[in-house]
Amino acid sequence: MLDLTNFDRIRIGLASADHITTWSHGEVKKPETINYRTLKPERDGLFCERIFGPTRDWECYCGKYKRVRYKGIVCDRCGVEVTRSKVRRERLGHIKLAAPVSHIWYFKGIPSRMGLLLDMSPRALEKVLYFVSYIVTNPGDTPLFKKQLLTEQEYREFRDKYGTDFQAAMGAEAILQLLDEIDLNELAAELRQEIRDVTGQRRIRAIRRLEVVESFRKSQNSPSWMIMQVLPVIPPELRPMVQLDGGRFATSDLNDLYRRVINRNNRLKRLLELGAPDIIVRNEKRMLQEAVDALIDNGRRGRPVTGPGNRPLKSLSDMLKGKQGRFRQNLLGKRVDYSGRSVIVVGPSLKLHQCGLPKEMALELFKPFVMKRLVGDGHAHNIKSAKRKVERVRPEVWDVLEDVIKEHPVLLNRAPTLHRLGIQAFEPVLVEGRAIQIHPLVCTAYNADFDGDQMAVHVPLSAEAQAEARLLMLSTYNILNPKDGRPVTIPTQDMVLGIYYLTIERPGARGEGKAFRDVNEAILAYESGVIELHALVKVNMGDGRLLETTVGRLIFNEAMPPEISYINKLVDKKELSLIVDRCYRRLGYKRTAELLDGIKQLGFKYATQGGLTIGMNDIVIPERKKEILGEAESHVEMIEDQYRRGLITFDEKYRQTIETWNRATELVTQELLNTLDRFNPVYMMATSGARGNIQQIRQLAGLRGLMADPSGRIIDLPIKANFREGLSVLEYFISTHGARKGLADTALRTADSGYLTRRLVDVAQDVIVREIDCGTDEYVEVGDVRDGTEIIEMLQDRIVGRTAARAIVHPETGAVIVDADEEILEEAAEKIVAAGIKKVAIRSVFTCKTRHGVCKKCYGRNLATGRVVDIGEAIGIIAAQSIGEPGTQLTMRTFHTGGVAGEDITQGLPRVEELFEARRPKGQAIVAEIDGLVEVREVKGRREIEIRGENGERVQYAIPFGARLKVQNGDRVEAGDELSEGSVNPHDLLKIKGPAAVQQYLLREVQRVYRMQGVDINDKHIEVVIRQMLRKVKIDEPGDTEFLPGSLVDILDLEEENRRVEAAGGSPATSKSVLLGITKASLATDSFLSAASFQETTRVLTEAAIKGKVDPLLGLKENVIIGKLIPAGTGMNRYRSVEVDPAVETPAKEVPTH
């Protein structure tokens, strides 16, 4: 077996026949599998014990040797080695092929590697390999030329004419001979010369051929290894055969495919021994080739081989591919023991760091711990009797269980786990019943509710795992959301409503204006019924000042930490969030957890005491509604009349009608808000942020308003009724369009958003904080992000928690606000904005020079903790989750914007995808390529723009029909400016203005989509992904470097190679920046394991094998695949080598657990 600790890279290559034979434990000669009577494997068959090892531990086939004491002996009767049966998962067999066959990956892949090496078209190659045409291998003294194809007829004619002067053959043997004759060094030199001499298509073809030749040269692979003479047979446990109830067998498809190969191979051997006619042998060889093709990649060429019911059989390639393939099913996601799942219910009495675990579940999960403790405490003599006690659930077991779970955190996970807050650690509390109890405040992070959601529980076993769960994953440490650094564990719904009710004031309430000596007296007066909860009273706060406040606010402030000043205002959800944030920043995790529990108790208590429920009478319909709608109707009739008389067009009529109804809806809403009492529960729920919004109240008590039809166009007939009055049939029908579209959209959105997250994770997974400072001099200047005149994101939000690249000085006083290389804190950011500074130079992930990751200075603050990021933090994954998780909230398809003549602009999720995949946008804007003056003119009925540059150069652009211009005659433009409305093609921008402009453009556009939906994401997450999209450059002229023209190379690799060449006096390579979409960037990574487990598995592995690629195992994914600890967090080498020195004794300190 692999020893996972002592290797740090893994290489893939082509295997020669000798390699395969040395790895193999024996040749599979027969197609038999298992004897149906004895149910034992047949000798020399596909499950043979002599080749693959015994089916039972320490027992040979014939039963002569049983028991572990014969370990390692090979039985003299049956030839089976006495060993563990699990060797049947790792021992390889082989089939010696009677004729060479080609490997379909290298012949059929795009581009065909064999075809490029031999300079043959894939079609010609196919004719030779499948015995349709002959190929000349040695023309001798004839007018034929090497690699010329001959049909059967031509071959016969030339044979008659020239006899044995030339050699021609067909099948894989002929190709094998040609591949053996290739001199790679000579061919490489010829191709380099050709690249210098020719242009156009021929040059491109030469470059592609040189790439393959160089791959073979560097990897020490021989081209002839693409033709197989020995076929490996994978271990039998990986292609199992099991007996079903009815005595029938269920088997893996691979066994069928191997059986076909063995049958055809044995038939071919027999035919060759018999000296059968050429045509029969040829047919058998072709069938063998096809059988091997089907085994390796069924369906790649021709029709796939099907099993019962016309189902294509799953070949070796299919075993690796897709969600059910080896990579994604077994290597990246495994089943976990010590886990369970159950329905969740609310546990309002739990503390923030606790969860309620059902007793039966806890007993099963902690079974080994309980058994060990039972033996240790003397309740049982040995493990066996302890196990019996647990299974029979004796009374003493419960006491031991109570003891065992103390201080032993468990992990709770809710699918879908969209971000790191989807798994958190809690201390379990045993509860009756069979449902897991969840603290109400962690529901937001999990996006959980109690309508039947289920959650999974996992038990961390080792001491290290428990320590990590407690110190890093405990729910009290997950108060901030990693995507924007704001609190995510904040009271919601009934708690918000309760606090709102508690802190609201009611003018004229009983006891208003009374004064009290201190807080206690005021509360006593309330409890005695002298004053009401909401009455404004004066209270002496102990420092001599009388404060006008309400008893409710006094009670609320009792729950506040003394360090936070008295909160004397109506507290809604926003205010609560600010309070939690302030408490966390000033007082830390523990005190915030206590505060949250306090607010939770108060909220529930007063929501109950206030009796805040909804009844029909709470929905009050405004009296003026009829009047307002009457006025609107008469106005619409007037517009209709104008249209009939031909005074306005249909479009104008439509637009004016919609404006009229919108105005009417707005008036009704205003009336409604004026009508509702401030203590009306419906109104309170909406204004406090507990549930619902004004729009929903409007539909309940006002009117439903305008609706959209299936295409998204607004129907100009509004629904005048509201839900309290009830809808007519027509009104109900109109409103179903939107409802159905909403449901369909949600379903699509979830899938699309999940796929986007997967691609983002893949592109950024190896971005880890690797060092403190990369030492770069480069920086990025940031200011407010604007969309026209509207500010999308303010300067202050953009610079908090970032590192200043240069000292930031007050423009008037000259005082230094922040030093260079220092973190910009909240107070400093406020000072910077107050000083009127509009642009700030900060360190950014964009300009970080750290290899395979980023440095602490360029990244800045870790938003999940509010402190500077630690080395080893997997910020790439966090970035991907932060962008992907809100993706589900973004709307789908395109919006029809009123007024723009039929122009759709892509918005929401599709726009984010378009940006990250660097696609050409729909409705593309024309971009100026040079600086100069604009002239708009009409030529032959079409408009065009001409830009006249300073030095006389002119560029013309044709304007597509219906495009709206952003510039006018005589305007001055700079390169990169948009000339027409629409989205800019990022590739054009990269060509014209360079990488920095593209980075800022993509950042701005992605932020714009999220901000429109009211989602806040910190810039740095988007920067991490964009940086990964711009990692590569395309080589123009390789100079004296090792690179090939047109190849994609990492920027840092290019700089390093250029330095090496220049030091040796050579000429460096020149290159141009390229922008890769996230899918392309993921596949262009250094790690072939990561790329293969993402998409296009066979293509990635084919290329990697030919290049003999080495995977340096730097990312997370490739380490998960081979089962090593990930090189992030506590899995980093710098943390792994820490050893505890027991020599120094320190007195134990009492550590309170929450």
From Swiss-Prot:
Main enzyme class: transferase
Cofactor dependence: Mg(2+); Zn(2+)
Annotated binding of Zn(2+) 2, by residue: C774, C848, C855, C858
Gene3D superfamilies to which the protein is assigned, alphabetical: 1.10.132.30, 1.10.150.390, 1.10.1790.20, 1.10.40.90, 2.40.40.20, 2.40.50.100, RNA polymerase II, clamp domain, RNA polymerase Rpb1, domain 3
Domain of life: Bacteria
Enzyme Commission number(s) from the entry: 2.7.7.6
Note on cofactor: Binds 1 Mg(2+) ion per subunit. Binds 2 Zn(2+) ions per subunit.
Residues at which Mg(2+) binds: D449, D451, D453
Covalent S-S links between cysteines: none
Protein name listed in UniProt: DNA-directed RNA polymerase subunit beta'
GO biological-process terms attached to the record: DNA-templated transcription
Record keywords, A-Z: DNA-directed RNA polymerase, Magnesium, Metal-binding, Nucleotidyltransferase, Transcription, Transferase, Zinc
Gene this chain is encoded by: rpoC
Catalysed reactions listed for this entry: RNA(n) + a ribonucleoside 5'-triphosphate = RNA(n+1) + diphosphate
Positions that bind Zn(2+) 1: C60, C62, C75, C78
Recorded GO CC terms: DNA-directed RNA polymerase complex
Function, as annotated: DNA-dependent RNA polymerase catalyzes the transcription of DNA into RNA using the four ribonucleoside triphosphates as substrates.
One Pfam family recorded for the sequence: RNA_pol_Rpb1_4
One GO MF term attached to the UniProt entry: magnesium ion binding
Organism: Desulforudis audaxviator (strain MP104C)
